[in-house]
Amino acid sequence: MTKLIFMGTPDFSATVLKGLLTDDRYEILAVVTQPDRAVGRKKVIQETPVKQAAKEAGLSIYQPEKLSGSPEMEELMKLGADGIVTAAFGQFLPSKLLDSMDFAVNVHASLLPRHRGGAPIHYALIQGDEEAGVTIMEMVKEMDAGDMISRRSIPITDEDNVGTLFEKLALVGRDLLLDTLPAYIAGDIKPEPQDTSQVTFSPNIKPEEEKLDWNKTNRQLFNQIRGMNPWPVAHAFLKGDRFKIYEALPVEGQGNPGEILSIGKKELIVATAEGALSLKQVQPAGKPKMDIASFLNGVGRTLTVGERFGD
């Protein structure tokens, strides 16, 4: 039985961990995840999905603020693990820890070398990629730069957003890891170096990148909106207030970018640089998320054709 330390944080990682727990070829000696955080306006302390999964399985849990140089790292090195599996952990692993293991692999939610970094699923959508995927790779000091052990792709559909693609790729990552790990541990797979000329980076989304620029095409804005749904959520400004847009569809239309072209009972169409967007799910300032019909029947009922959204 191969003894593992698992490291991860969000739901994506929890799905991978649960997959490993179903396979009797592996024993999880410890789980490392990010510390509990205060979230929301009420600052409620929230455990990571990986911590919740580990607690349900009765596993030992470590939550160092920073792994490098921590007492927790020294403890982990004394457990006698054969290797480390990480999936969206959110911290760099120290070379000292990596060097103490027979192997260390990462489950990364992109088709490397494209989309290295912390937001690969977001950028796959924002940049209009036709496919997404998962790469199992060896861990090295440089971020997402290790040799590739295996890759698996799935198509991106127009119905996908960050939430749906996360769910799909979590299952792909779980299955690909379980399919790959035995042969890799046995030495039957020769990892492939990444083509550095094809590397792109997908860092965490910055707040200023959440703003919609109506001078882009309807397709570009459609991809940005779904590439930030359900988090961090794209926004524009309407009458000076922040206006979040969760869902919109590209449609035909022509006008000044940001101009309201049409208002119906269940329709609000806004011009872009090329074509238009039909807004479907929005959140006005100080209000909950709602469908466009609810918005137009409520706080949006005073809108008129010709008014403009800011960016």
Swiss-Prot record:
Reaction equations catalysed: L-methionyl-tRNA(fMet) + (6R)-10-formyltetrahydrofolate = N-formyl-L-methionyl-tRNA(fMet) + (6S)-5,6,7,8-tetrahydrofolate + H(+)
Listed A to Z, the keywords are: Protein biosynthesis, Transferase
Q: Does the keyword Transferase apply?
A: yes
Q: Where does (6S)-5,6,7,8-tetrahydrofolate bind?
A: S110, L111, L112, P113
MF terms in GO: methionyl-tRNA formyltransferase activity
Please state the Enzyme Commission number of this protein: 2.1.2.9
Its cellular-component GO annotations read: cytosol
Family annotation (InterPro entries): Fmt (IPR005794), Formyl_trans_C (IPR005793), Formyl_trans_C_sf (IPR037022), Formyl_transf_N (IPR002376), Formyl_transf_N_sf (IPR036477), Formyl_transferase-like_C_sf (IPR011034), GART_AS (IPR001555), Met-tRNA-FMT_C (IPR044135)
Query: Does Protein biosynthesis show up as a keyword for this record?
Result: yes
* Signal peptide positions on this chain: none
- Report the domain of life of the source organism: Bacteria
Q: Which NCBIfam families match?
A: fmt (TIGR00460)
Would you identify the family this protein belongs to, as annotated? Answer: Belongs to the Fmt family.
Against HAMAP family, the record matches this protein to:
Formyl_trans
Biological role stated in the UniProt entry: Attaches a formyl group to the free amino group of methionyl-tRNA(fMet). The formyl group appears to play a dual role in the initiator identity of N-formylmethionyl-tRNA by promoting its recognition by IF2 and preventing the misappropriation of this tRNA by the elongation apparatus.
Q: What is this protein called?
A: Methionyl-tRNA formyltransferase
Query: What species is given as this protein's source?
Result: Streptococcus pneumoniae (strain ATCC 700669 / Spain 23F-1)
What gene is this protein translated from?
fmt
